[in-house]
Amino acid sequence: VFGAKVEAGRVDRRVSNPIIATPWLTADASEAVLEIPGAARFHVWQGRHVQVQVMPGASASVIRMWLEGMVASLVLIQQRRFALHASTIRVGGRLVAVAGPSGAGKSTTAALLAGRGHSIVTDEVTAVDFAVREGVVIPTVCPSGRRLRLRRETVERLGMSRDGGEEIIGTGKLGFPLVPTDHDELSLELVVVLRPEGGEVVSDVHALTGPAALTALITNTLRPYFCILQHQAHLRWIAGLASAVPIVQLDRPSNRWTGSRVAMLIEEAAMGGRDTDGLRPRHAAESNSTPRADLPVAPLTPSSAG
């Protein structure tokens, strides 16, 4: 998990002076104990080691779900690293992070873009680091190895085969393995924030700058409530990311399917069809769009492995 070694073993540790203290999680900046009733107890230490005590009857797919999500977030925080709650796709050779709250359509959008010939790099968790290249600070993303997780009804709507999708018990979702990328780190070039809205909303994009961009990045940080553990480092990360990458917001209606148009708008923004420094909302009427169910999701590997 992001370089941390994962081992099975009994978890008896307690965090003596926690900054976060809830019935299920105690944590400070370097240590955390997470307890998921009926699933497992996890001890995360210094961002380098994870010990897992699996409860009787817990399925491997559920344990992996927690390792890829909550535990991965704690590992990153202890490493003084941060992630966007985003799926990341290579669109026309450019790396785009599609962020948004749970249920905004991040994974669905990633699958739609994959069906249009693009490659999924990460799903839901996009850890962003900074590298210096020729004197310029560049935000970079490392593939997480996380599965693409889609609801069954989404799989059916997209016309995808369930072959190779592992059921994640208790979630109503299937996990599909992603094709490994041949790069260890990729330059992030655009962040798209999905914003579902009720009513007659036109799907369109507009640039976010200044406080609006900072607020969007803070809101779409993976589990932002964990960032109290590394508050100053998180603020520096937000400022660095906002100054290095265009941030755009994509408004879409929450009451009808607009997946194909959303995918097209992201392609336009990523591939230069629109000026991401000057995007403005449009107010023209939008017709209902329908998914292209005949498109295969090329970057997904049919496999029974989770």
Please place each PLM-identified region on the residue numbering.
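Long, basic/Gly/Ser/Thr-rich N-terminal segments
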Residues: V1-V54, E268, G273
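Long, low-complexity, intrinsically disordered segments
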Residues: L295-G306
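Glycine-rich, often acidic-flanked micro-motifs
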Residues: S87, G92-P101, G115-L279, L300-T301
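Conserved lysine of the Walker
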Residues: K106
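Extreme N-terminal, non-catalytic leader segments
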Residues: Q46-G92
